[in-house]
């Protein structure tokens, strides 16, 4: 199957998806068929902040059409934040959308996980992953920590690099979520790997992007549902 990715939102997340898929195919000794198109991260942040799902879906639509013209069989958005408009995108997309949200729901059910902490954008956290994992009790950052996590995440994703202060925020808040009963903390923002990769944060972590990448890989081999 030919995979189509909408990237650029942010650039580091795109590279993370690409590297993950390359490694998965190499381990399976298979040849990957992949096309990536670029979307603007600042435009996404603007529409996400405004809650304008229709506008962002219309931004993504010509990119999906470009992927279709390139031969892609389905499309995936390489951003948890970008999934805020996934329902609107599915309604207009000429290609099937490899939606991370039902993938996460199946993942948690399969692992028997009932309570998770969330780190990511304000929208992802406040909507509890867009209401897509109702069987899971989501633990959110409290008080000013929610705004701090959102701001640090957006700044990190836009810059495609993490500062020590930003990493300290994510680790401190993550420890608090774990102390408040979260079985694990889900990295609900794709670029959070910049802060967590290769680090000992002191609490269990589930990377939503890694779950999505594995599902995309399995779908492309015909081994998983959309």
Q: Could you tell me what each predicted segment is?
A:
Residues 1-226:
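Non-catalytic structural scaffold of enzyme domains
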